[in-house]
Amino acid sequence: MITIEQLLDILKKDHNFREVLDADGYHYHYQGLSFERLSYDSRQVDGKTLFFAKGATFKADYLKEAITNGLQLYISEVDYELGIPVVLVTDIKKAMSLIAMAFYGNPQEKLKLLAFTGTKGKTTAAYFAYHMLKESYKPAMFSTMNTTLDGKTFFKSQLTTPESLDLFAMMAECVTNGMTHLIMEVSSQAYLVDRVYGLTFDVGVFLNISPDHIGPIEHPTFEDYFYHKRLLMENSRAVVINSGMDHFSFLADQVADQEHVFYGPLSDNQITTSQAFSFEAKGQLAGHYDIQLIGHFNQENAMAAGLACLRLGASLADIQKGIAKTRVPGRMEVLTMTNHAKVFVDYAHNGDSLEKLLSVVEEHQTGKLMLILGAPGNKGESRRADFGRVIHQHPNLTVILTADDPNFEDPEDISKEIASHIARPVEIISDREQAIQKAMSLCQGAKDAVIIAGKGADAYQIVKGQQVAYAGDLAIAKHYL
């Protein structure tokens, strides 16, 4: 429960309070109301709900519906003049985060918090950390792929970083379940829209940076994207940073006065020898490591997670066992066809991660290589040119472009846009299952491979704003082995 006096105090301390308006006019103080629930969904309110009117598409009609269900007061940046009191604020999203934090009893203070950011590798690194910490502790995890609040049951995540009301409710459940640590992926969007406003992480990890999520409804420029990524560093007590990433010198200057550790080529923490399923490291993680996920970049993700977990109480033995146990749904899943050709299923969904994926496969498969790829609709439009550029640099690839969450766009138009950046013919088969089936039918021997990129373990396609049932790349590939 939270009282009106408590929430006004929170807003005033954050300099985010304008006034309370009701039929009697302006009020700096207000009393007599308390709330047992928080919501930003007008369909889920009653007389004991504190409602947040948020979003560019919010309509007064939503508020009218809530009032008919008993709503007594709402928080907003706008007075909709509907006859009930409104707490006016300058920034509704910041208000949501701080009020949710207090409402749920500040659960962040009862957990050790580890956050990963980066253009790629967040989910893989989070899974590595989860398995490392699980050896001696009770970690919860919020990832793009799956979320677990008790370490036993997992459910599909809706957002990389949950909305603040959901985030703190889930954190509180983690505390109730006796969890000791929480591992999170923190996206640039989470900072852009203040989902983690006011939250300080025990350790923040910056894996890498390359252009992505740049478009009309995301970040307008790379500078804006990079800036919002860096906010994790400002909001972490200690940081772990990849010294091999672009703009590392800038980041090193930024964190000079913080507790920090670097890994990679310009640091003391490096991978010294690398095999397909093992590596050796020097520095704080000196030793031999077995790993199920192939690719040097996955070994670097393991290093990043290991250095972070070392700061959070994990032993070197915990880290070695955790790395050896880690598998990630939809990340570098490898199947073998009856004719011994390989099928790689991976979530690679931007130019940089696609380049990494192709390089790993080409290292091991030297025959005919088939690539199945699409790009999502109505987001990240810059990826389409990036995909074309990467494909153009791999002339040995036979490419079939297909649907990948087309949303409100025509998947064929998206494929044509990607194709316009490739200086050789490619095939377009918008039905994703048909594209996979055809590619697999063209592989004939152990040196051949099909690479199915983009959706990973997602068992749906986003079409016209809805999740439409889709068997999933892995399930379809298994069917045609």
From Swiss-Prot:
Q: Name one GO biological process term.
A: peptidoglycan biosynthetic process
InterPro entries attached here?
Mur-like_cat_sf (IPR036565), Mur_ligase_C (IPR004101), Mur_ligase_C_dom_sf (IPR036615), Mur_ligase_cen (IPR013221), MurE/MurF_N (IPR035911), UDP-N-AcMur-Glu-dNH2Pim_ligase (IPR005761)
Span-the-membrane segments of this chain are none
Q: In which pathway does it act?
A: Cell wall biogenesis; peptidoglycan biosynthesis
**Has the keyword Phosphoprotein been applied to this entry?**
no
Q: How is it modified after translation?
A: Carboxylation is probably crucial for Mg(2+) binding and, consequently, for the gamma-phosphate positioning of ATP.
Residues that coordinate or bind UDP-N-acetyl-alpha-D-muramoyl-L-alanyl-D-glutamate: S42, Q158, T160, T161, S187, R195
Provide the reaction this enzyme catalyses: UDP-N-acetyl-alpha-D-muramoyl-L-alanyl-D-glutamate + L-lysine + ATP = UDP-N-acetyl-alpha-D-muramoyl-L-alanyl-gamma-D-glutamyl-L-lysine + ADP + phosphate + H(+)
The record lists its disulfide bonds as none
Q: Where in the cell is it found?
A: Cytoplasm
- Placement of sequence motif L-lysine recognition motif: 404-407
Q: What does this protein do?
A: Catalyzes the addition of L-lysine to the nucleotide precursor UDP-N-acetylmuramoyl-L-alanyl-D-glutamate (UMAG) in the biosynthesis of bacterial cell-wall peptidoglycan.
**NCBIfam families tied to this protein:** murE (TIGR01085), PRK14022.1 (NF010628)
> What name goes with this protein?
UDP-N-acetylmuramoyl-L-alanyl-D-glutamate--L-lysine ligase
- In the UniProt record, what gene is named as encoding this protein? murE
